[in-house]
Amino acid sequence: METTPLNSQKVLSECKDREDCQENGVLQKGVPTTADRAEPSQISNGYSAVPSTSAGDEASHSIPAATTTLVAEIRQGERETWGKKMDFLLSVIGYAVDLGNIWRFPYICYQNGGGAFLLPYTIMAIFGGIPLFYMELALGQYHRNGCISIWRKICPIFKGIGYAICIIAFYIASYYNTIIAWALYYLISSLTDRLPWTSCTNSWNTGNCTNYFAQDNITWTLHSTSPAEEFYLRHVLQIHQSKGLQDLGTISWQLTLCIVLIFTVIYFSIWKGVKTSGKVVWVTATFPYIVLSVLLVRGATLPGAWRGVVFYLKPNWQKLLETGVWVDAAAQIFFSLGPGFGVLLAFASYNKFNNNCYQDALVTSVVNCMTSFVSGFVIFTVLGYMAEMRNEDVSEVAKDAGPSLLFITYAEAIANMPASTFFAIIFFLMLITLGLDSTFAGLEGVITAVLDEFPHIWAKRREWFVLIVVITCVLGSLLTLTSGGAYVVTLLEEYATGPAVLTVALIEAVAVSWFYGITQFCSDVKEMLGFSPGWFWRICWVAISPLFLLFIICSFLMSPPQLRLFQYNYPHWSIVLGYCIGMSSVICIPTYIIYRLISTPGTLKERIIKSITPETPTEIPCGDIRMNAV
């Protein structure tokens, strides 16, 4: 008897008309023909509903059927899956909870009405952020592909979205890990009996350095600077050696060594796939919560802590009448949860087919939002302490935003606490682990996408491809390691990646809800989970979530941020440069649409129909289909 060798690369299975194919335990969903799409009985994207058969027939229960003869390729062996369910949850939480939760949310909250800001933030999370988060998890888990090849199974004409996501991920890796390098430099500098940013007697200090904690009756002038500020600006960043974007200065060898060390850790954490990264996140995703708990208890016991808490949460309801508050709430929840970056697609693609991604979406979203909220207490109890020590209002202490809030204000507060070295070490180690989680996720999104799209080239060479990606990211980070690197980091964050990712997410939401079809998408979810998403989710996916993204994009275009950093005003040409960098990723979408229409044979109408019709089947493990649909 002839048998198929276990190491064979593929098995060809021919599907007859109006049938789904079952081969080697895998259910193949076929692709409809152009004629079938025109039939009024067809549901979205041309799939026709197949009536349920008897309970004994496990091969098909309300599964959309193929309406054409199809030769489908089935690869031997199953896709890699997470070792444990908790590996996946910790990876998603580690990705969503990043540095922005620690510095951005508390600052935006108090700037936009304190406790009143929680209302628009919650509304935007419920109607915008969480539905998009759930959509990506469901898409990735059902189709089991990265952000490039998944579009062959959804709507091929939008495959450029995947390429755009990969380019954006590279830009983010180029500047985000530089911030982690700053934290690592601080961590190494903290391994002393006395923290170096506590005095004005170091080689990098200037005559304006004033340590108001050292003695009483210190006169603070407009030109006075704190030891922590000079350590950050003149020693770590060496910003005084740069005149701006037009003259970035030399590359810091100290920061270069830090970023090489960081990417070395990243490489050995993700080179073997989710089996290894899923174990690493047990440390990197849980350690920040231990440190946050310690810092929260310590901050609450400091004198003046209550002043900071009141300043953080005191509601200003009049702020809700300002459009900017709602824009900030929408942007914060979107960038915090992180749909549109391809990461959720990649992570979910390694889940088991019947994993409850609906529950996962709710749990991880709530954990992320609560972490942001609690981080505000960690930050503002310390700011209240700083205000008490300076005999100033909390608003005067909380003027720093972004990384400066952590590397200047919070670092200075830690330096003047008892056991300052201990708290400095755990604080900066927490920042590093927060950043590493997000980098693991961002690069895994790219790696999964490329390996799924080019399996014959890279499937058995993952370690080498990961090495290429890591080296490319290190080289891309060189500009941010210069004396003026902080200027580059801010430009990339505000203009090169933010608007681009919003645009990509908007097109993705429209492509899934309007082209692939909300009916078909909900049918897919029902096959996995045994129940169909309710009307709330359908309305959000079809209308509210796209409008949510469009609202942020339009607000950004009408009122783009005026960049200013460390008394440096960005020139107009730099803003144009930022937009151009952002467009270099988004341009992949219309470029691929044009390429697809040109390369597809037939009339224009036939080309369009073929280009929006799924071209490859979705493999569904038959034993994993839920039959208890309600």
Curated annotation (Swiss-Prot):
A GO MF term: sodium ion binding
Tissue localization of expression: Expressed in the intestinal crypt epithelial cells and myenteric neurons of the small intestine (at protein level). Expressed in the brain.
Gene Ontology, cellular component aspect: endomembrane system; endosome membrane; focal adhesion; membrane raft; neuron projection; plasma membrane; postsynaptic membrane; presynaptic membrane
Main location: membrane
Residue ranges of the region described as Interaction with RAB4A: 616-624
Membrane topology, from the record: Multi-pass membrane protein
Phosphothreonine carried by residues: T276
Example GO biological process: cellular response to cGMP
Segments on the Extracellular face: 113-115, 187-252, 298-324, 381-421, 484-494, 559-574
Region (Disordered): 23-60
Stretch forming the signal peptide: none
Modified residues (Phosphotyrosine): Y47, Y142
Annotated phenotype, changing C109A: Cocaine is effective at blocking transport
Transmembrane annotation, as ranges: 88-112, 116-135, 161-186, 253-271, 278-297, 325-347, 361-380, 422-443, 464-483, 495-516, 539-558, 575-595
Matching InterPro entries: Na/ntran_symport, Na/ntran_symport_serotonin_N, SNS_sf
PANTHER family, per database record: SODIUM-DEPENDENT SEROTONIN TRANSPORTER (PTHR11616:SF105), SODIUM/CHLORIDE DEPENDENT TRANSPORTER (PTHR11616)
Described purpose of this protein according to its UniProt entry: Serotonin transporter that cotransports serotonin with one Na(+) ion in exchange for one K(+) ion and possibly one proton in an overall electroneutral transport cycle. Transports serotonin across the plasma membrane from the extracellular compartment to the cytosol thus limiting serotonin intercellular signaling. Essential for serotonin homeostasis in the central nervous system.
Subunit structure, interactors included: Monomer or homooligomer. Interacts with TGFB1I1. Interacts with SEC23A, SEC24C and PATJ. Interacts with NOS1; the interaction may diminish the cell surface localization of SERT in the brain and, correspondingly, reduce serotonin reuptake. Interacts (via C-terminus) with SCAMP2; the interaction is direct and retains transporter molecules intracellularly. Interacts with filamentous actin and STX1A. Interacts (via the N-terminus) with STX1A (via the H3 domain); this interaction regulates SLC4A6 channel conductance. Interacts with ITGAV:ITGB3.
Additional notes on this entry: This protein is the target of psychomotor stimulants such as amphetamines or cocaine.
Protein name, entry field: Sodium-dependent serotonin transporter
